[in-house]
Amino acid sequence: MVPRVPQPGIWCPAVTFFDSKTDTLDLASQERYYAYLARSGLTGLVILGTNAEAFLLTREERAQLIATARKAVGPDFPIMAGVGAHSTRQVLEHINDASVAGANYVLVLPPAYFGKATTPPVIKSFFDDVSCQSPLPVVIYNFPGVCNGIDLDSDMITTIARKNPNVVGVKLTCASVGKITRLAATLPPAAFSVFGGQSDFLIGGLSVGSAGCIAAFANVFPKTVSKIYELYKAGKVDQAMELHRKAALAESPCKSGIATTKYAAAIFSAKAAGIEDAEEKLRPRKPYDPPSEAAKQEVRKVMAEVAAIEAGLS
C-alpha cells in the first residue's frame, strides 16, 4: 500500500507524447515511457504537472494519462496527479477524475487567474475547501511563474497544513531553500513532505531537510538525478556534489522552456525507452513551437557528458 505522505526521493513530472498529425495523445508511447521511468530509480511519477502541458489538455485527456500511467507502472508505484484549474469546482472535478483513474496524491496550484483578487484569505479558503473534499491527499504546488506571480510564503503553507491534515506536502518551484528550511523545521516529515521543484538545488534542499525534489530534468536523465539523491543520503557528499554540479550545468538549456526539455527527453530517455520517432511525438502541443536547430545543438553539446554518465548507470 502506498503511504499517506509522499515518500522521500526523486519524483518525475513526466512529459506528454502527441501524434503530431492528429494533435491527439499517443498513449502507446506514453505507456512505454511511464514504464521506463518507473524502472529508473525514481520514487514516484507526477502525471499532469507543468511539463506535461496539463493546461493544454482536455478533462478527458487528463484522466486518460493518469489511467495509462497506472496501467504502465502497476498497482503499487506512487502516482501524483496535477489537478490545477481556475476554480474550486474545476479542481474538485479533476481530483475526482484522478482518484477514479488511479492516482495516490494530487498536486494543487493556488487559484491565480485574477491575480489581484487572489488574496491570502482566498488562498487559505481555497485549500481548506479542496483538502476537506478531496478523497486523495493534497500536495500544495507553489509556482509563481505560472500563477500570476502568486507566491505562497512558508507561514501561509504552514497555516494551511496545520489546519488541514489532508494536506501532506508541498512542491516549491519558487526555488527558495529558505522556505524549505523553515517548513522542514516546522512540519514533521512523517506528516508533511517538502519537495524542491527543480533538481539544480537538490542538495541545497536536502541539506536543510527537504524530502527530495519533483524535477522536470528527471525526464531527461532519471538515473542520474536519482543517483545524486542516493549518494547524498548515503553520506557520499563529495561524490554527490560532483555529479550534481555536472547535472546542473547540463540542465541549463531546459531553463528556456518546455520545448527544449521535451527535445532532450526525446533524444535521451525516450530513446532509451525504445520509443520510435520520439522527437516528433514530443513536440510541444499547438500553438507552441519546437526548439530551434540552434537550441537542439546546444542541448546535444551541453548534455553530452551527463548522457554518458546516465548510460553507465544501472
UniProtKB/Swiss-Prot annotation:
The active site is at K171. The record marks Y141 as: Involved in proton transfer during cleavage. GO terms for molecular function: (4S)-4-hydroxy-2-oxoglutarate aldolase activity; (R,S)-4-hydroxy-2-oxoglutarate aldolase activity; 4-hydroxy-tetrahydrodipicolinate synthase activity. SMART domains: DHDPS. Signal peptide: none annotated. May catalyze the final step in the metabolic pathway of hydroxyproline. The lineage of its organism: Eukaryota, Fungi, Dikarya, Ascomycota, Pezizomycotina. This is Putative 4-hydroxy-2-oxoglutarate aldolase, mitochondrial. Pfam families: DHDPS (PF00701). PANTHER family: DIHYDRODIPICOLINATE SYNTHASE, DIHYDRODIPICOLINATE SYNTHASE-RELATED. The keyword Nucleotide-binding does not apply. Disulfide bonds: none annotated. InterPro entries: Aldolase_TIM, DapA-like. It is an enzyme of class 4 (lyase). Its EC number is 4.1.3.16. It catalyses: (4S)-4-hydroxy-2-oxoglutarate = glyoxylate + pyruvate; (4R)-4-hydroxy-2-oxoglutarate = glyoxylate + pyruvate.
